[in-house]
UniProtKB/Swiss-Prot annotation:
Family annotation (PANTHER family): CHORISMATE SYNTHASE
Keyword line: Amino-acid biosynthesis, Aromatic amino acid biosynthesis, FAD, Flavoprotein, FMN, Lyase, NADP
Protein name listed in UniProt: Chorismate synthase
Enzyme class of the recorded protein, top EC level: lyase
A GO molecular-function annotation: chorismate synthase activity
Catalytic activity: 5-O-(1-carboxyvinyl)-3-phosphoshikimate = chorismate + phosphate
GO cellular component terms listed in the entry, alphabetical order: cytosol
Pathway as given in its UniProt record: Metabolic intermediate biosynthesis; chorismate biosynthesis; chorismate from D-erythrose 4-phosphate and phosphoenolpyruvate: step 7/7
Residues the record lists as binding FMN: 125-127, 238-239, 278, 293-297, 319
Record function comment: This reaction introduces a second double bond into the aromatic ring system.
Binding residues annotated for NADP(+), in chain numbering: 48, 54
Cofactor(s), by name: FMNH2
Length: 364
């Protein structure tokens, strides 16, 4: 398995499985001198970790991260940063019944066919448990981005099933278990999720993530465009089936006169492009949306097959999220942060001495 790393100058490599001894990651390329403690990462890990509300999986993991290397006297040294989180609440016996059975909608079948074997305990490497390390690495990037460049990243649950946010109040996001920006919809969300649990089913979601303070110039055309790398990173999150930058698929019904983001020295008139033009950041907020499919592990019976090719009806046992979108908010933030961090370092390496006679467009 070779696809365990992301980035060129800021490189994050993760390892570990859902029911293994531990999860870990190596961060290469973090500049020296950044003040970094466990607490800097723990906040986002606590936002992602399981068992924190009745709307998520009942699996309880402390997700306490340990810094193994790359930090001395509270500051990064410029060497590889090693991070580790131990798994403490595995119940592998919950999965003994599916040892020789493929769960429909999961990676069981494709992993078996590709590698000739699979870790059936909680999905092994394909489990969203792996994303804990992405969040830890993303927290390092988020701190650098904010402290050195003034870039801030915020994500929120924009839609859960049929319920979408009508108003966006960023102050509400951390005040509820849904990371939802519209307080008027919280009661409806709670009622919907309670009904979903009773039915044994699951539901999909849409997440919006945005970065403010991003300077002009990030992105490496043509194949490493900023929006292409953002889409690549976000699409790599478990259960994500769609990514939009800016207006995304909404541009299909737009006319050129509607979606061209008129500009003046004082600022852009709109941000349909999501802060990226020609694969390069424009200085506007970088905005992306992701669609996550409903959890496939549900207690509603469904047809599947065994390793031997026999057809069966099955119910997936274990502890699962009825909506993976709720805990995916900090994951989306982390992946956007990792991409922006990587592109900042790449831009600095090639273009830090570049000057332009054109004034930078302001922010309205």
């Amino acid at each position: 398995m070779s696809g365990n790393s992301i980035g060129q100058n800021f490189v994050v490599t993760t390892f570990g499985e859902s029911h293994g001894v531990a999860l870990g990651c190596i961060i290469d390329g973090c500049p020296p001198g950044l003040e970094l403690t466990v607490e800097d990462m723990q906040h986002d890990l606590d936002r992602r970790r399981p068992g924190t509300s009745r709307y998520t999986t009942a699996r309880r993991e402390a997700d306490e991260v340990r810094i193994l290397s790359g930090v001395f006297e509270g500051k990064t040294t410029g060497t590889s940063i090693g991070l580790l989180i131990e798994n403490t609440d595995q119940r592998s016996q919950d999965y003994s019944d599916i040892k020789d059975t493929f769960r429909p909608g999961h990676a069981d079948y494709t992993y078996q066919q590709k590698y000739g074997m699979r870790d059936y305990r909680g999905g092994g490497r394909s489990s969203a448990r792996e994303t804990a390390m992405r969040v830890a690495a993303g927290a390092v990037a988020k701190k650098y981005l904010k402290q050195v460049h003034g870039i801030e990243i915020h994500g929120y649950l924009a839609q859960l099933g049929p319920i979408s946010a009508d108003t966006i109040d960023l102050t509400q996001i951390e005040q509820n278990a849904f990371f939802f920006p519209d307080a008027s919809k919280l009661e409806a969300l709670d009622e919907y999720m309670r009904g979903l649990r009773k039915s044994g089913d699951s539901i999909g979601a849409k997440i919006t993530v945005a970065a403010t303070g991003v300077p002009v110039g990030l992105g490496e055309p043509v194949f490493d465009r900023l929006d292409a790398d953002i889409a690549h990173a976000l699409m790599g999150i478990n259960a994500v089936k769609g990514v939009e930058i800016g207006d995304g698929f909404g541009v299909v019904t737009q006319k050129g006169s509607q979606g061209r983001d008129l500009m003046s020295p004082q600022g852009f008139a709109s941000n349909h492009a999501g802060g990226v033009l020609g694969g390069i950041s424009s200085g506007q907020p970088v905005v992306a949306h992701i669609a996550l499919k409903p959890t496939s592990s549900i207690s509603v019976p469904g047809q599947s097959m065994t390793v031997q090719g026999e057809t069966i009806d099955m119910i997936t046992k274990g502890r699962h999220d009825p909506c993976v979108g709720i805990r995916a908010v900090p994951i989306a933030e982390a992946m956007l942060a990792i991409v922006l961090m990587d592109h900042l370092l790449r831009h600095r390496a090639q273009n830090q001495d570049v000057t332009s006679q054109t004034p930078v467009i302001g922010m309205r």
